[in-house]
């Protein structure tokens, strides 16, 4: 198991949930956290603990984002008009690495970030190598020609464990995706319950 995969599954164990819906997740076999004290029975969480856990789960889902980066995304969501929790989800789903993952160009969100960073993707015909790049509705994301036959890409397309959401249009023959619109929470196919309103409460304390 690679260091990246080990880190990913550590997040699953820490949360006690299979947050990406992966068949190989260790929480499918056990229901306790990582480390030597992982099997201890957990007590009831305080309100702060519940909010913190919701933040860690959402932050972890999008590739274990750094706290400074995640907080900056939240701050922008809070500045925008409308519901902050919905704005937060919209900003996270507009990230280029998130769209590459949703389009099933790669098997995991961790792989999506690396895939983008290595220059395998273009946006509207221009190569972009920043995973946090924010896409707009109508943007066309394409896997570069020389990258279309990479093993990780071919394996991802064949994965049956998740579907492409309806706010992204994909042609897997051409390896092209169009970001149709910024989604709301109810649009996003999270395998587990995400509670961005608790993230808002956490940062509003």
Curated annotation (Swiss-Prot):
Keywords associated with the record: Ribonucleoprotein, Ribosomal protein, RNA-binding, rRNA-binding
Pfam families: Ribosomal_S4, S4
Stored InterPro entries: Ribosomal_uS4, Ribosomal_uS4_bac-type, Ribosomal_uS4_CS, Ribosomal_uS4_N, S4_RNA-bd, S4_RNA-bd_sf
rRNA-binding is among the record's keywords: yes
Cited PROSITE patterns: RIBOSOMAL_S4 (PS00632), S4 (PS50889)
Protein name: Small ribosomal subunit protein uS4
Chain segments carrying region Disordered: 1-46
GO cellular component, one term: small ribosomal subunit
């Amino acid at each position: 198991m690679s260091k990246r995969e080990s880190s990913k599954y550590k997040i699953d164990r820490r949360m006690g949930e299979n947050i990406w819906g992966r068949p190989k997740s260790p929480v499918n076999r056990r229901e306790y956290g990582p480390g030597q004290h992982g099997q201890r029975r957990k007590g009831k969480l305080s309100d702060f603990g519940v909010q913190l856990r919701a933040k860690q789960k959402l932050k972890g889902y999008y590739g274990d984002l750094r706290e400074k980066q995640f907080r900056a995304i939240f701050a922008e969501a809070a500045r925008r008009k409308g519901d902050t929790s919905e704005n937060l989800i919209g900003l996270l789903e507009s990230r280029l690495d998130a769209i590459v993952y949703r389009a099933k160009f790669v098997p995991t969100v961790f792989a999506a970030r690396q895939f983008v960073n290595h220059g395998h993707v273009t946006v509207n015909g221009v190569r972009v190598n920043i995973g946090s790049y924010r896409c707009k509705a109508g943007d066309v994301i394409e896997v570069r020609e020389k990258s279309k036959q990479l093993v990780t890409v071919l394996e991802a397309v064949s994965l049956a464990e998740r579907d492409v959401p309806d706010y992204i249009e994909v042609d897997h023959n051409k390896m092209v995706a169009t970001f149709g619109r910024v989604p709301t929470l109810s649009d996003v196919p999270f395998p587990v319950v995400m509670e961005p309103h608790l993230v808002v409460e956490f940062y509003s304390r």
